[in-house]
Amino acid sequence: MERMRKFLKFLSQRIVIVTFLIFLQIMWFVGMFLKVTSYSQYITAAFKILSILVVIYIMNRSDNPSVKLGWIVVILLFPLFGGLLYLTIGGKQPISHLRRKLEPMIEESARHLKADPKIEQELKEKDGSTASQIYYLEHQSGFPAYKDSKVDYYPSGEDCFKVMAEELRKAKEYIYLEYFIIEEGIMWNTILDILEEKVKEGVDVRVMYDDVGCIFNLPSHYADFLRKKGIKCIVFNRYIPIFSTVFNNRDHRKILVIDGDVAFTGGINFADEYINEKQRFGYWKDNGVRITGKAVYSMTQMFLQMWNAFALEKDKLDYEKFCLEDVRPLAKEERGIVLPYSDHPLDSEFVGESVYINLINSAQKYIYFFTPYLIIDNEVVTALILAAKRGVDVRIITPGIPDKKMIFLVTQSYYSQLVEGGVQIFQYRPGCVHAKCAVCDDKIATVGTINLDYRSLYLHFENGLFLYNNDTVMDIKKDILDTLEDCNRIMPEMCKKNMFFLLLQGILRIFAPLL
């Protein structure tokens, strides 16, 4: 009886119902297609010719080679309808409605984000390599570099959460949250209690969360529940029963802005596993950062872009009310440069991946990574191996206990090639590494939400911080070195697998860019 109740509860979940309806659409599409092609061999031949033409078209596109390979394999396996399938869901057309909403907001935000030419000039004179990276980010991501900014690094979700709660209790004007995952429990309920109290004090509280990220954790009407408490809420890109790849484009960002003076980002979401109140995959190794000073202004603008793109007209925020000059100055001068940046799937500029590649190519002594997933294209693989062959100390820390076992099989499929090329890979013994960051040569680091995998690099909305020559860089390095003490290094002999296992990994790796 208990099993039956659990089974019925599972069947009643929204994701199950919506997925089933999409499955029915696919079956109807396949059935109708086979029926049409059965009428005439000429129709069948026409669709096969279409598939050949689509393969030629894909070969001449400027897409990532791994993505092109995945689609070509699909079309070759199913030549009858593979070409039509690509034309239906393979291009960028499904995200056109996201582009229409977001691009005007990004353009409006750009009017308020101005780079300081003095910073660029100073960097050119003393560090041309870093100057070029900052130039790239300012022009491709649209967010400027700042001095007079401070970043505090927290090597665990528990540490970051405590400071988040403290800062939230100090809020006087507004609290803006944009997160991929929210789940009821100790962490979120603590935050929600503070938010409710702040609403009563007249603070403007707004929450934006991703629908797929929360689909197992929150009821479908949770946004209404928050609105009844006085919290304005948007659910990003709802999962609805329509067959489309638009649902691949998720809001994976983690942004908390308080009064325009303090901001947080990093790897942690609002769920108990991120602060180790619930352990499903051993110890959850994550991180977070607090930003103060002028760089908070860019974090505010990131939230404004996404919020105004999807809010009702009456709930939209006025860009003119947010000024860089209003950001609370630091108590003392901080050294170094902080550049918050974002990445989105609305164009062919993959900022997150380019930041990582630029760091790898510029590394002289070492480059270290935290990443929960390692599913990368040939450009990143080549950059990592070439860096190792140049004598750079390249180290990557991945989970010892993964949160997604099938994805981890794909991650492990890269080990052999990288290890043979001189890259050192380590698995974290106590549990799951969920932090996403890199540190290079004691002077540059990047930290945020961007995993080394296809979804983060090509499909999701993401955000990060580029840090140069400030104390946080060394804090990140220390965290990675401390974590290495609890890791097992992957040796060449450990990469040898049986033929069946290698075949499975190879198949998963081919289709990874399409998942």
Named regions from a protein language model:
Residues 180, 372-373, 407:
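Glycine- and other small-residue-rich loops at beta-strand/loop junctions that grip anionic moieties
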Residues 390, 395-440:
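A beta-strand-loop signature enriched in Asp, Gly, Thr, and Trp
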Residues 1-354, 358, 362, 402, ...:
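N-terminal localization/anchoring segments of enzymes in phospholipid and broader phosphate metabolism
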Residues 363, 373-394, 399, 404:
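Helical hairpin unit composed of two closely spaced alpha helices linked by a short loop
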Residues 216, 371-374:
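Residues at alpha-helix boundaries and short interhelical turns
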Residues 370-371, 398, 428, 447-448:
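Thr-Gly-centered strand-to-loop micro-motif
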Residues 383-387, 413, 481:
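Short, solvent-exposed amphipathic alpha-helical segments in soluble enzyme
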